Amino acid sequence: MRVRARARSRRALVSAVSAAAAASLLLSGCAQDPKEASGPSGAPSGDKARLTLTVGVFGAFGLQEAGLYDEYMAQNPGIRIEQTSIERNENYYPQLLTHLGTGAGLADIQAVEVNNIAEITATQADKLVDLGKTPGVDKAAYLPWKWAQGTAPASKGGATVGLGTDIGPQGICYRKDLFEAAGLPGDREAVGALWAGDWNKYLETGKAYKAKAGDGKAFVDSASGVMAAVTGSSAQRFYDDQGKVVYKTNPAVRGAFDLAASFATEGLSAKLQQFTPGWDQGFANGSFATVSCPAWMLGYIQDKAGPAGKDKWDVAQAPKPSNWGGSFLVVPKAGKHAEEAARLAAWLTAPAQQAKLFEKRGSFPSASAAYALPAVSGAQHAYFGGAPIGEIFSKAAQGVPVTVVGPKDLVIAQNLADIGMLQVDQKGRSPQEGWEAAVKAIDNALDQ
């Protein structure tokens, strides 16, 4: 079975719906994938006197689209910024590793996806600038867990080589009309209280929903989506703090798998695979009442559920905070202008710029200092009944535990979902059979 790359869907899919999402944010000031390469944003051509900084990204990263390059160049007339973009991270990242290995072909600033940052900090930190020492960078302005992700292990020097651009704090998006029809509250505060602090309460709410709603209206979109959210709320997941793979013996991982499997065995799942046409149609048809949703998914839901879903969908706090998604900027030492590039990377990821990126592109800030800025603190989403998404997702982001991210986290997570849980959800296999199938696939992938 081909393992589906859930992680890569995020950047491409968000870019397609970010314009709609931004239009629905009731903000004070308030996409589509680029070609293989995109030139300087608003910079005059042929200006030989300007120092050119290059930025390499994947997908529609948002920095250029939000006008941040233009703003920086206006503030720094001697700087010209050029961006190149490769559409998919699975093509971009191997090239980045190759270029880091040779020290050639690198942009002055390179983007790194969260699923790759552990490998970068563990194996490439010596080739990257310590951005934690860049003037203007304040560790206290960033979420501790995000800062930790971009920092190399102590055994590798402990340098902070990646500055976070965005994150994906999760809530629970739900159909309030379906909740109310099943005798459950529709108000987001009351809904969040149903399962506050315990994912098992989310399961019990699903059982109560099914008892009234009956067959044909599933409670969740997929068991895999539940598993990812539950696993993401644990401090230790697939690796321990010594870098050892421990998912097989970690009770948090097996517990998340078994709990998610219960949504399938109890008949609460719509048995859909995320980011497939069937899943998209499920939003349009109202085939399920809830989905674990990171901040960036709201625009996707709006796009797929369409006008008919406006004011029917809402968003509440998840049982426990977790995160899905996010990226970083790194500065290779081999670059021609490493010092100037570090200053640009620091500016692009500063709280003020992250707030602008959220306002214009819907990318949720990884700098906690941005949460007090009006563009974030006052953000509401018209499609989701005016939900105070700035408040909801800021609270979730600040509660995410500092987690150990391993170099093969994505491989393990994909196989648990697409090999293990999918068999339970769609094929009726027992949870034990699904677990064993996933372990076998992971062992093969990791050559264990």
Labelled PLM ranges:
Residues N116-T121, A295-G309:
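A ligand-binding cleft/hinge motif common to bilobed small-molecule-binding domains
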Residues E113-G171, K312-D314:
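Hinge/lid segment of periplasmic solute-binding proteins
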Residues R2-E119, D138-A140, G186, K336, ...:
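Conserved N-terminal structural module of periplasmic/extracytoplasmic solute-binding proteins
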Residues S85-T98, N115, W195-K201, K271-N285:
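Short helix-initiation/N-cap motifs at beta->coil->alpha
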Residues L203-K207, Q242-Q273:
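Glycine-centered hinge/linker elements that transmit conformational signals in sensory
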Residues T265, K304-A369:
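Extracytoplasmic/periplasmic substrate-recognition and gating elements
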Residues D108-A111, A289-P294:
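Paired acidic/hydrophobic, glycine-rich loop segments that form the ligand-binding mouth/hinge
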Residues F384-K440:
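C-terminal capping/gating helix-and-loop segments adjacent to ligand/active sites or protein-protein/ligand interfaces
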